């Protein structure tokens, strides 16, 4: 699990390989990741959007952005956390993801971002 904290927003990430979706003939690699976002600030914030950078080892970086996460734009009051699980498909056996969540301070209306820490996506056979 990896963690980071930016401007009072703490983000934790864990990831795992989806062996149940893998076939050697298909040669695509599926991973899930769980994100937990904690509001360590003294005021409420709303998650507006996300920006992901997905590194496919030896094949470059793709960027994915969009509104909210898993169809939601959660509001987090001070001390509250929000968790969700999502997935990623790689065209190679190893990669990495990192990015940013964009928030609005619901007290001042100020917009800001929090970094999503980099985390590895590795086909487990490569670790043996």
Located regions from the model:
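Asparagine-centered strand-capping/turn motif at beta-strand->loop junctions
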Residues: 37-41
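Intrinsically disordered, low-complexity Pro/Gly/Ser/Thr-rich segments with frequent PxxP/GP/PP motifs
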Residues: 62-94
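Short, solvent-exposed loop/turn segments enriched in Ser/Thr/Gly
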Residues: 28-34, 98
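Short, surface-exposed linear segments at secondary-structure transitions and domain or protein termini
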Residues: 56-59, 72-81, 121-128
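Terminal connector regions
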Residues: 89-128
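Low-complexity, acidic Ser/Thr/Pro/Gly-rich terminal tails and inter-domain linkers that flank the onset
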Residues: 1-27
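Short glycine/serine/proline-enriched coil/turn segments at secondary-structure junctions
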Residues: 22-23, 44, 91-95
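Short acidic, flexible loop segments centered on an aromatic residue
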Residues: 43-62
């Amino acid at each position: 699990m990896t963690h980071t904290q930016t401007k009072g927003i703490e983000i934790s990430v864990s990831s795992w390989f989806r062996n149940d979706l893998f076939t050697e003939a298909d040669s695509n690699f599926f991973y899930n990741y769980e994100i937990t976002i904690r509001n360590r600030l003294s005021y409420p914030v709303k998650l507006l959007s996300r920006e992901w950078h997905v590194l496919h080892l030896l094949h470059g970086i793709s960027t994915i952005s969009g509104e909210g996460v898993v169809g939601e734009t959660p509001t987090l009051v001070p001390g509250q956390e929000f968790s969700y699980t999502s997935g990623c498909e790689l065209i190679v056996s190893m990669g990495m993801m990192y990015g940013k969540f964009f928030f609005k301070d619901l007290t001042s209306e100020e917009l800001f971002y929090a970094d999503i820490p980099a985390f590895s996506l590795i086909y487990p056979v490569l670790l043996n």
